[in-house]
A protein has these predicted regions:
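Structural signature of nuclease core domains in nucleic-acid processing machines
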Residues: 1-231
Length: 231
């Protein structure tokens, strides 16, 4: 319904990270729902959205900074802004609704992410998205499966321990301290993204989408013949 009517919004945000390097800018376009109370929206065509979720979470944060600052400016001018801080992530079988964030908190989260981004050239940062997603929203066994992989008959679905970036990170970790064993599940709950999402994990709504079951051609023909015989 209202998800069909969408438009793009340009954001241009400035942040003072107090790092001695001046202001940091975040500029980009976000897809939002139409109507009188637009909110951020994104579509994922995969059932497994773990690898997309945290990227969407980052967009959600900057969208809330955008909305919060516009709302503050609008109130000062006597014209409150109506953009919604809620965000919707659509997959092929679920609707994920992320709650609006208070402006002060959204700005703090945004600053944390920008500091992390600015420091990546000097200090690598390991983040296992699928394993962390499983820790937040799924069972412990699924955390292990996301990291170690799964054997299904003769097929193997690789886990994040086989990821080339993780392997490289572990390989060079010995240069700055104790080497990391790439086959051991690392501590996941001390990352920025885990801590941020954990604060709101109980407020994130997940609704199942009803997927119509396709009717085979032979079944349609049988039903048509039955209908003709009843007439």
């Amino acid at each position: 319904e209202h998800y069909v009517d969408t438009s793009k919004v340009t954001i241009d945000l400035k942040f003072d990270l107090q790092s001695g390097q001046g202001l940091e800018s975040v500029v980009g376009e976000l897809l939002v729902t139409g109507g009188s109370n637009p909110g951020l929206i994104e579509l994922s065509l995969s059932k497994n959205i773990a690898s997309r979720f945290f990227g969407f979470w980052v967009k959600h944060i900057f969208w809330n900074v955008h909305c919060g600052r516009l709302n503050n400016t609008g109130r000062l001018n006597g014209h409150p802004h109506k953009d919604s801080g809620e965000s919707t992530l659509l997959s092929i079988d679920k609707i994920w609704t992320l709650p609006a964030l208070p402006l002060e908190l959204a700005e703090r989260y945004a600053s944390e992410i920008l500091r992390l981004s600015c420091g990546l050239e000097k200090e690598p940062y390991a983040f296992l998205a699928k394993s962390t997603f499983a820790l937040l929203f799924e069972k412990e066994t699924q955390v292990k499966s996301a990291f170690k992989g799964i054997n299904i008959g003769s097929s193997v679905i690789q886990g994040e321990r086989d990821d080339s970036y993780w392997q490289r990170y572990c390989m060079f970790s010995g240069d700055t301290g104790s080497p990391i064993n790439s086959d051991e599940l690392p501590v996941l709950n001390d990352t920025i993204f885990y801590k941020q999402v954990l604060d709101f994990v109980e407020q994130i709504e997940v609704a199942e989408l009803e997927i119509p079951v396709p009717v085979s051609k032979s079944k349609r023909e049988t039903e048509a013949q039955r209908g003709r015989s009843e007439q």
